[in-house]
């Protein structure tokens, strides 16, 4: 069975009707704010893509995609997306988006190998976004400015939610704190990556951890990243590797850190080749997506994903993501959650 994290003195603040209304309020308001902040146009996204083109997101490189044959294509295999990280960049080229503008989608995915708990579901829904940037924007300072604008949109949505439902009290700090994964390692050398995230988030409330995917000074990664979307190997102006990271907050309902978004400046030709070599995946250079990038047919970009159910869960102060979205959960998990006051949909 999956793991259940026991909430801290949990009592739902909204009934089922209020919860459904709150979900709609948050989703409508946040996506409007996000699109305005980053100048994004909504586009329609696929649920599945053809296998073998290198378009699907490999996540950490070990997760199996849900696959099925297509009769009218001679049983060619399609994969349900894990995310749209690479598809979005292809779409930027197709739509001929100018620098400073971008796209966002309502992304729905199935991650069959997900380890289920209060935050992780088989079903993933997120706002996947991607924007065209200039060569001179491939800097840490630019990345930070985008993170701050996204965080501002999150806080505005928290304010509206608390105004609509006065029983919900705001808890997000005014500012988000930035730290590199290697600096975090040096602060807490005896802790695991997850324990380091908990410690820094409890200290600052909201944190952006920079440089996830490359090896740190101890020879280990903070967390895995595929080599062909985020740039985690370029040395930034701070002298450290990585132009990507995660937005995390301290979530008092569960007494732990909580990831809301993974994002970053995307690989250019040089960093793609470098990261494929580091990961021993040079054979991927021949795939469709990679050839498009290596032959200068794709724009430079920045992008990421923001969990829809996760954001709703946090802003509505829910103890389990299954209180926000409909998915499949082990019977034992449903029973244990009910014992703690969490009624899964």
What are these regions (language model features)?
Residues 2-120, 128-132:
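Class II aminoacyl-tRNA synthetase-like tRNA-binding/catalytic domains
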Residues 21-25, 29, 138-145, 288, ...:
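Generic recognition of stable, solvent-exposed alpha-helical segments in well-folded globular domains
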Residues 23-26, 30, 34, 68, ...:
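Generic structural hydrophobic/aromatic packing signal, biased to beta-strands
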Residues 34-42, 150-161, 319:
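A generic secondary-structure signal for well-formed alpha-helical elements
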Residues 43, 52-56, 168-181, 330:
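N-terminal pre-domains immediately preceding structured catalytic cores
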Residues 61, 73, 96-99, 103, ...:
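A generic structural signal for short, non-catalytic loop/turn and secondary-structure boundary residues
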Residues 105-199:
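Extended, charged alpha-beta segments that form solvent-exposed binding/catalytic grooves
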Residues 110, 181-345:
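A translation/RNA-centric and nucleic-acid-associated enzymatic feature enriched
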């Amino acid at each position: 069975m999956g793991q259940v994290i026991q909430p801290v003195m949990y009592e739902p603040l909204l009934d089922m009707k209020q919860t459904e209304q709150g979900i709609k309020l948050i989703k409508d308001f946040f996506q409007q704010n996000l699109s305005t902040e980053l100048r994004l146009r909504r586009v329609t996204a696929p649920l599945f893509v053809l296998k073998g083109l290198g378009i699907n997101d490999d996540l950490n490189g070990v997760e199996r995609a849900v696959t099925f044959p297509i009769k009218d294509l001679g049983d060619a295999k399609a994969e349900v997306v894990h995310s749209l990280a690479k598809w979005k960049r292809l779409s930027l080229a197709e739509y001929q988006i100018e620098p400073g503008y971008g796209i966002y989608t309502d992304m729905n995915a199935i991650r069959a190998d997900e380890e289920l708990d209060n935050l992780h579901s088989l079903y993933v829904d997120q706002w996947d976004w991607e924007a065209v940037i200039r060569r001179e924007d491939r800097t840490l300072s630019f990345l930070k400015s985008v993170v701050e604008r996204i965080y501002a949109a999150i806080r505005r949505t928290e304010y509206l939610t608390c105004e609509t439902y006065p029983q919900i009290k705001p808890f997000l700090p005014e500012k988000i704190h930035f730290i590199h994964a290697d600096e975090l390692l040096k602060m807490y050398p005896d802790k695991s990556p997850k324990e380091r995230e908990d410690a820094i988030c409890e200290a600052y409330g909201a944190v952006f951890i920079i440089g996830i995917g490359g090896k740190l000074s101890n020879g280990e990664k903070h967390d895995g990243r595929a080599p062909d979307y985020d740039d985690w190997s370029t040395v930034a102006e701070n002298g450290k590797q990585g132009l990507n990271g995660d937005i995390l907050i301290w979530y008092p309902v569960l007494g732990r850190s909580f990831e809301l978004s993974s994002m970053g400046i995307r690989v250019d030709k040089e960093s793609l080749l470098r990261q494929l070599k580091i990961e021993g995946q040079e054979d991927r250079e021949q795939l469709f997506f990679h050839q498009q990038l290596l032959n200068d047919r794709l724009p430079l970009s920045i992008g990421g994903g923001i969990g829809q159910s996760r954001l709703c869960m946090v802003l509505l102060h829910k103890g389990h993501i299954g209180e926000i979205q409909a998915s499949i959960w082990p019977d034992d998990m449903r029973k244990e959650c009910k014992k703690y006051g969490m009624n899964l949909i």
